[in-house]
């Protein structure tokens, strides 16, 4: 049978078919109507572009501060809302752990501010038998977006640009200067912003002041934020929830053991014999069914997200002096503090009959006076006794503090008549610490009081503290030189980057102890018969005394386990040198190539830390062919690397003294080819990429073969063990409909973004065992983002509608295998759930009130659609920083329903 092939029109084809002929017609019309016009001098601030560093711009996104305002970016999750292929890594307790790009995440994606690397995600192993998967925070400090002038997001290996960590990509922030606040022709500038986000009840207030007098200038930005957890769709938390709570059995029926009677010595003032008629029976317990709102429910079946209180304060101060029109010296002082206070309400607040073991604990059920519940308890952590009258609360308090100060010298030669067009010398001293504290209370009725503590009036109350502080400090010297020049009618744009870094990493374990209020108790036994046996005729004789609070330190030193509170110190230094030359070969082609050499040396007083010296050479090469004025053909190849993190260097400790391991850098190779259509109609880019990763570091053993049998060799630990490869498609475009057809309004536009990743390969080195193949839970499901908007030509007002569609998370990306001995393997799965397809529609707009005021508003999830993103559900995956375990229901991961954002900006 003959098949009939039909050509299907879609938005992409329609755009190209209509745009290209019109563009060609416009070019001819322009050539026919050329006129000699007066010279107009226009001054404009240079904007960062996708091709500033690398000629092709493949895989890159650049957002200016104006773009961030227009997209109403108020936090890290808003930054990549409409950018498929890059996602935020949820830390599991309100914070974040960087970004995921092309199947990799956390420390495998470089994060810098003004060229200075931010803190690593340091995940320390948790205590054995606990509910936590990480003892430390595992977060990466977040950036204050009101301080940001521009952000460059690079997808694909690019260590030749950003060095260590740019294995799969990078996110580079550039902070504002006084010139970004002071308007053209003015000597001062003031900007104020007040914003509210309904999805997390977040309020942002920011004020920027800048001034210039003579050659002196200064910038000061202060930003304060506060908010709560992101609220799930209202339907996800509807109704009530029920649970069992262990309570005193006030309505105890007759029966039970005949040996349940006792008298209290302190209540028998006339002797034992006289008190036999004041018998007491052992108190007993029962499970009582309770029904509460979904907000108050605690347990694995909780429907709502854990409550969170978030706060942030940031200062950025940049004074400087223009010595003349070419030379500038300045300084920068930055301080940002962020707090994330969370209560883990997936931990049940109350005991049940499953926790209660009658008759096994001394004095169980005995009591003084009428306080029948005072000695009803269960045995908890560290053999502590915890009363049933209190509720348990588990709280995580995180404090992220960043301090940076530095100086810089900038040389800018607009005439370009010396050896350098631009040079910058800088020194930055940066310190970041993440203070993470676990507090477990059992001293208030329902467990909600974080500040309660055991005391003499609360028998069998309990408290636990566990604190980890991770700190990184850096002293970074940077030098940048740029020069544009011509040789044989070929235009060169040469840049040289040099840097030297001294760094230190420290993990401190402290405030690790238990407190338990214990009541004095004794069973009094007479010297001669009859001996009490608990019967009515011969009741037990007990003494119940005062309650004292016992504090038990858990910290140990030098035992190489989680309880080891010896500080983990790793220091070192490194340097790099990079050269990039982007060459324009007339109008037909651009080529670029770059190379970078990195050196790092580390040391530690702990001889079990895998320190050493690493040398790495990275490169990139790109070409842009321009066969037509309306089309570019692009190709890019680049490499990336990641050095072992400080946590991996410290290793996995299980009590024994470990040998150091020879950890090599992880490596990646990126190839990407694209086609770009451009003209009056806008631009459209489609590209195909292929990324290979090798020597990925994972936990496992080496193998050895003897007499035909393979066995595990050496200590367990982190080793170069995994290889992986992905491929995919990326589409990015913006259509100017007025450029397509002049009859349409000037300012009407459409945007298009699409990203798809397919796993090609994942394997384990043959000389490794008990290693799981790389699981691609970090891959974002395929996503389309379509936009239709209008901006008034004079910038008075604008409106934009964004439609996002995500495919389901592929089960193939979650499946893997664990290599065992002698060729055997176990199937592994990253997560027990995956997400279904979803879509969401957002509408946002702005209106400029007169000249100085801009009102912005947005309605997100306009149709109030209930959906769940993979980024949220991924918190239950094995690779999560703080994995959510024993999840009963997944409602808590639902995205917000219809929500609103408002902001008012003032610029003077």
Swiss-Prot record:
Domain (TBDR beta-barrel) ranges: 187-908
InterPro entries: Plug_dom, Plug_dom_sf, TonB-dep_rcpt-like, TonB-dep_rcpt_b-brl, TonB_box_CS, TonB_Hb/transfer/lactofer_rcpt, TonB_lacto/transferrin_rcpt, TonB_rcpt_b-brl_sf
TonB box (motif): residue ranges: 38-45
A molecular function GO annotation: siderophore uptake transmembrane transporter activity
Transmembrane segments: none
Compartments (UniProt record): Cell outer membrane
Family: Belongs to the TonB-dependent receptor family.
Protein name listed in UniProt: Transferrin-binding protein A
Organism: Neisseria meningitidis serogroup B
Species classification: Bacteria, Pseudomonadati, Pseudomonadota, Betaproteobacteria, Neisseriales
């Amino acid at each position: 049978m003959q098949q009939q092939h039909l050509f299907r029109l879609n938005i992409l084809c329609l755009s190209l078919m209509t745009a290209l002929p019109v563009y060609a017609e416009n070019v001819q019309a322009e050539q026919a109507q050329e006129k000699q016009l007066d010279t107009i001098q226009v001054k404009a601030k240079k904007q960062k572009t996708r091709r500033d560093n690398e000629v092709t711009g493949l895989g890159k996104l650049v957002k200016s501060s104006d773009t961030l305002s227009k997209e109403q970016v108020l936090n890290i999750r808003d930054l990549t809302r409409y950018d498929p292929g890059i996602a935020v890594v949820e830390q599991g307790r309100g914070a974040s752990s960087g970004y995921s790009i092309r199947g990799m995440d956390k420390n495998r994606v470089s994060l810098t501010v003004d060229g200075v690397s931010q803190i690593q995600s340091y995940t320390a192993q948790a205590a054995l038998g606990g509910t936590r998967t990480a003892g430390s925070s595992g977060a990466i400090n977040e950036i204050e977006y009101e301080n940001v002038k521009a952000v460059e997001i690079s997808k694909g290996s690019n260590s030749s640009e950003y060095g260590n960590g740019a294995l799969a990509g990078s996110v580079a922030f550039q902070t504002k200067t006084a010139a970004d606040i002071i308007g053209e022709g003015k000597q001062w500038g003031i900007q104020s912003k007040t914003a509210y986000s309904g999805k997390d009840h977040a309020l942002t207030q920011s004020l920027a002041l800048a001034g210039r007098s003579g050659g002196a200038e200064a910038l000061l930005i202060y930003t304060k934020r506060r908010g709560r957890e992101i609220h799930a769709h209202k339907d996800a938390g509807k109704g009530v929830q029920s649970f069992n709570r262990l309570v005193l059995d006030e309505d105890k029926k007759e029966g039970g053991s005949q040996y349940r009677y006792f008298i209290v010595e302190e209540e028998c003032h006339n002797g034992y014999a006289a008190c036999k008629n004041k018998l007491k029976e052992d108190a007993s317990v029962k499970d009582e069914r309770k029904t509460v709102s979904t907000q108050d429910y605690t347990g694995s079946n909780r429907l709502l997200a854990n409550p969170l209180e978030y706060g942030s304060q940031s200062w950025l101060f940049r004074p400087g002096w223009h010595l003349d029109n070419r030379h500038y010296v300045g300084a920068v002082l930055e301080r940002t503090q962020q707090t994330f206070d969370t209560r883990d309400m997936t931990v049940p607040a109350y005991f049940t009959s499953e926790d209660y073991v009658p008759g096994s604990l001394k004095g169980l059920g005995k009591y003084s006076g009428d306080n029948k519940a005072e000695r009803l308890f269960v045995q908890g952590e560290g053999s502590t006794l915890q009363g049933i009258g209190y509720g348990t609360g588990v709280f995580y308090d995180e404090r992220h503090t960043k301090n940076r100060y530095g100086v810089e010298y900038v040389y800018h030669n607009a005439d370009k008549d010396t050896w350098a067009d631009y040079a910058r010398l800088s020194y930055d001293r940066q310190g970041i610490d993440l203070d993470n504290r676990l507090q477990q209370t059992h001293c208030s009725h329902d467990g909600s009081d974080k500040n309660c503590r055991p005391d003499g009036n609360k028998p069998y109350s309990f408290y636990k503290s566990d604190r980890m502080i991770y700190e990184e400090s850096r002293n970074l010297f940077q030098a940048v030189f740029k020069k544009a020049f011509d040789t044989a009618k070929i235009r060169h744009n040469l840049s040289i980057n040099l840097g030297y870094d001294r760094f230190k990493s420290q993990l401190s374990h402290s405030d690790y102890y238990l407190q338990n209020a214990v009541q004095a108790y004794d069973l009094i036994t007479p010297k001669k018969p009859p001996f009490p046996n608990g019967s009515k005729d011969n009741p037990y004789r007990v003494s119940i005394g005062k309650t004292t609070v016992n504090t038990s330190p858990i910290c140990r030193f030098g035992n190489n386990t989680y309880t080891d509170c010896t500080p983990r110190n790793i220091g070192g230094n490194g340097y790099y040198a990079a050269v990039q030359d982007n060459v324009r070969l007339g109008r037909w082609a651009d080529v670029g190539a770059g190379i970078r050499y990195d050196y790092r040396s580390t040391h530690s007083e702990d001889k079990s830390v895998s320190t050493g010296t690493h040398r790495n050479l990275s490169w990139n090469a790109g070409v842009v062919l321009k066969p037509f004025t309306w089309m570019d053909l692009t190709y890019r190849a680049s490499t990336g690397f990641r050095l072992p993190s400080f946590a991996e260097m410290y290793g996995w400790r299980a009590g024994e003294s470990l040998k150091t391991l020879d950890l090599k850098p992880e490596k990646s190779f990126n190839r990407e080819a694209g086609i770009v259509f451009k003209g009056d109609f806008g631009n459209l880019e489609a590209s195909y990429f292929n990324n290979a990763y090798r020597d990925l570091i994972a936990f496992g053993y080496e193998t050895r073969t003897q007499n035909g049998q393979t066995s595990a060799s050496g200590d367990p630990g982190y080793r170069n063990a995994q290889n992986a490869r992905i491929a995919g498609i990326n589409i990015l475009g913006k259509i100017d409909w007025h450029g397509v057809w002049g009859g349409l309004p000037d300012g009407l536009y459409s945007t298009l973004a699409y990203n798809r990743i397919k796993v090609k390969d994942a394997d384990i080195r043959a000389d490794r065992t008990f290693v799981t193949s790389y699981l691609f839970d970090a891959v974002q499901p395929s996503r389309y983002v379509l936009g239709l908007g209008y901006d008034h030509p004079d910038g008075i007002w604008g409106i934009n509608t964004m439609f996002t569609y995500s495919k389901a998370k592929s089960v193939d990306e979650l499946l893997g295998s664990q290599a065992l001995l002698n060729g055997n393997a176990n199937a592994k799965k990253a997560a027990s759930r995956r997400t279904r397809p979803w879509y969401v529609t957002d509408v946002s707009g702005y209106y400029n009130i007169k000249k100085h005021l801009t009102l912005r508003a947005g309605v997100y999830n306009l149709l109030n659609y209930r959906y769940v993103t993979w980024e949220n559900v991924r918190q239950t995956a094995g690779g999560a920083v703080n994995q959510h375990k024993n999840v009963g229901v997944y409602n808590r991961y639902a995205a917000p329903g219809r929500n609103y954002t408002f902001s008012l900006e003032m610029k003077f």
